[in-house]
């Protein structure tokens, strides 16, 4: 997993509350057994005027010119600014996969659905909770200024505006450690590889018949 320390990027304002995971990545795209290939269908029902299906050539589809991600000024955005209860609905981990593959590493909102919030950390993304009044202010600034950028500093736990204002956010120490060091569940396990090997050696001496059956 890619480590996260400080990110500076263009902000895309998604001015909608209660965006659920089916809107983030629709159910028809969940049939793949891979973790990749979802970014092209992020917010599919909103980005396109025709219905999408897995494996489709999106270059031939009808783009919705009114949807925020399709506007030229937000191309290359890597920070998503959203409204309350972002990521509600089903627990599909495909939602952060799609956001991440599209290019978003940071999502800022007044609140998140719990499972989506947890899944972001597991996939190298930083979900930041800021007061609704602050999000309102950032929304206005983003709409008013083309190319508006924010900086998310995980080490210091602050969001920094172009004019130098800083907004503090909370993050669990363990999750912060994992993001800063690029550790997913597998990475965390590998950190304990020596202890795991020691345990296996002890168990092989204590219960050798179990390991003989496994080898067979």
Curated annotation (Swiss-Prot):
Keywords: Amino-acid biosynthesis, Branched-chain amino acid biosynthesis, Leucine biosynthesis, Lyase. Its EC number is 4.2.1.33. Pfam families: Aconitase_C. Pathway: Amino-acid biosynthesis; L-leucine biosynthesis; L-leucine from 3-methyl-2-oxobutanoate: step 2/4. It is an enzyme of class 4 (lyase). GO terms for biological process: L-leucine biosynthetic process. GO terms for cellular component: 3-isopropylmalate dehydratase complex. It catalyses: (2R,3S)-3-isopropylmalate = (2S)-2-isopropylmalate. The keyword Amino-acid biosynthesis applies. GO terms for molecular function: 3-isopropylmalate dehydratase activity. It comes from the Bacteria. Heterodimer of LeuC and LeuD. HAMAP family: LeuD_type1 (MF_01031). Catalyzes the isomerization between 2-isopropylmalate and 3-isopropylmalate, via the formation of 2-isopropylmaleate. Belongs to the LeuD family. LeuD type 1 subfamily. This is 3-isopropylmalate dehydratase small subunit. It comes from Psychrobacter arcticus (strain DSM 17307 / VKM B-2377 / 273-4).
